[in-house]
Amino acid sequence: MSDLKTVWFGMLTDDSDDSGTDSSIVLIINVRGGRFDVLHRTFPDTNQNDQEQGQANLYEITEDDFEPQPFVGSTVDPQDLNASSIRIGIRGDDMWRPKSIFIWGEQKDGLIVPLALNTELQGDVGIAGQLVGVALSTDSGEGKLSFAPARVQLGDQTVVIKRLLMLLTTADVDNAGTDGDIALQITATDGRVVVDHVFPDTSQDDLERAQANLYFAPVDIPFTRGELNADSIRLSIKGDDAWVPARLFLFGLSEPEGGQPPEFVVPLVHLPTWSLGTLSTDEREGQGSVVLPLLDNIVLL
């Protein structure tokens, strides 16, 4: 058992008309129905396209953002959270429609812990009780004030991965963004290429300076983390327009697109600070591809 050191909040706003908002979004964490919240974080404006239609955002919450606790230096132990401990709310009547939400944390012992995930909040049918048609607003005629995202569990090395979730931000420096495509390839230890995916253009500001992106990727052959080694995961760029990431995270999901809501999330790559250099097929500017380090602090059961 260990308290959280950092919480990450990734989101994608729906691409339908009037889905974006100028109202502030708030993340609330409460432990087992306690009388006081342990986290009540209202997100300020950033250099990202905050909650704009069709855009992704990625925010970091640190220890300093948590409410003071009875024990100095403590935040919250993920094992103390229940199905309604985490809520996402809005501070204004400008309605917001989120499409996808992912919240995870890093414990003080270094373990990466998935906390909540909704892959599709605007679908027509809620599978297995999944929320659909979520809209937030302080105007009760437009939406709800808050909702509880679906809790997920940390997957171990035996969980079969059927879909991928990648979140990233591009550096906020001159010429960091790119118009080039990036690709992800994952090769199992037996030589099988289980993922070979080029990320297409989306409604997001793809790989643009200071912007966040949230992408799902299909899995060609289901696999487990136990079938990977240090050289299994490779990220490449398909052109000479250089790209400089700021951070990148990759997770495996236990269910494919259109299936049941994922129960397990397997952390694969966790780079809160990108240190692998510039990507470009022009060797004068960077490397055409890099091996992404496989996260080694997964729980081995």
Map each language-model feature to its residues.
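Regulatory, non-catalytic segments
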Residues: M1-L301
